[in-house]
């Protein structure tokens, strides 16, 4: 499932945009609660369980420093990957059993160009960034990819399969997902630029 291919004209510098995005970064959905807090010590710490992340940043953390931004984005990616690996495959397996569908394997990837994909071999890839989305949209992407197990296209039979699994809400959910893609496009563009070629040590 491809995301909207938006190339926005940024009205502020990449560093300024990242500073604002990171200061206000929070996830509060039925699947995940992710909070950034500022502590009183000079060290970062993380409290993590499945469905919950609390990242305590060092006192005086400088959101405008490019190196700090890169570090924080990479930490966010690492934590989202952990959550996605523990939450998304079990949901996919549950839906597959419910609708009597058979897939091969599920992979969680750091991809922002699309939310998910299904190969002709029955392998399903899901973006770790799905953890940002509301539960109903996350489930929609999972069901969308499961529908491709029977229909490897986006024709009428495919949408009939999606509607079968979404109580005839396939097109409406697709529109909502496209709107969510628009809302996250600039953030993804900036985060990708800042972290390109870097990994956590």
Protein language model features and the residues they cover:
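Active-site-proximal or metal-binding-adjacent scaffold patches in catalytic folds
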Residues: 1-139, 149-201
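Walker B beta-strand of ABC/ABC-like P-loop ATPase nucleotide-binding domains
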Residues: 142
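Walker B catalytic acidic pair
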Residues: 145
């Amino acid at each position: 499932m491809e995301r909207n291919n938006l190339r926005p004209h940024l009205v502020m510098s990449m560093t300024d945009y990242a500073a604002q995005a990171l200061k206000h970064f929070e996830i509060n959905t039925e699947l995940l609660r992710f909070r950034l807090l500022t502590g009183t010590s000079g060290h970062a710490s993380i409290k993590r369980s499945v469905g919950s992340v609390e990242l305590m940043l060092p006192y005086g953390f400088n959101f405008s420093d490019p190196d700090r931004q890169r570090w924080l984005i990479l930490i966010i990616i690492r934590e989202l990957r952990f959550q996605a690996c523990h939450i998304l495959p079990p949901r996919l397996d549950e839906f597959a059993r419910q609708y009597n569908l058979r897939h091969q394997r599920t992979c969680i990837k750091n991809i922002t160009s699309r939310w998910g994909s299904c190969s002709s071999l029955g392998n399903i890839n899901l973006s770790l960034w799905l953890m940002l989305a509301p539960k109903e949209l996350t489930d929609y992407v999972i069901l969308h990819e499961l529908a491709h197990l029977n229909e490897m296209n986006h024709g009428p039979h495919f949408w009939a399969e999606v509607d079968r699994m979404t109580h005839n809400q396939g097109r409406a959910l697709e529109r909502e997902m496209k709107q969510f893609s628009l809302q996250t496009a600039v953030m993804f563009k900036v985060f990708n630029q800042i972290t390109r070629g870097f990994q956590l040590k």
